[in-house]
Amino acid sequence: MSKEMEKKIQGIADKIAKEFKPEKIILFGSYAWGTPNEDSDVDLFVLKKDAPNPRELSGDIRGYLWSAKMAMDIVAYNQEILDKSLKKGNFFIRNIITKGKVLYER
């Protein structure tokens, strides 16, 4: 990933952190794994422990970042859903948590 793109992605994470105050933001997918191409989107996992409706939070974050004009996929979880997913052995979530790049942590 280029330094310019790295700065852009970190800036997006900083905006999310400031506006939504999550516990953690993790970059996953092709940008985190070092395999982006011209069609890649930015994949972000956002953990907000007390989010009553994580799906709604994902939509709110997407709306907030609309002006960034960048293809993004936002996956938001609260602590309860994260714990259940990890307990069930959800490979997708475990992969994000163990191999993703932490951009923000409170």
Report the location of each language-model feature:
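Conserved H-loop
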Residues: S30
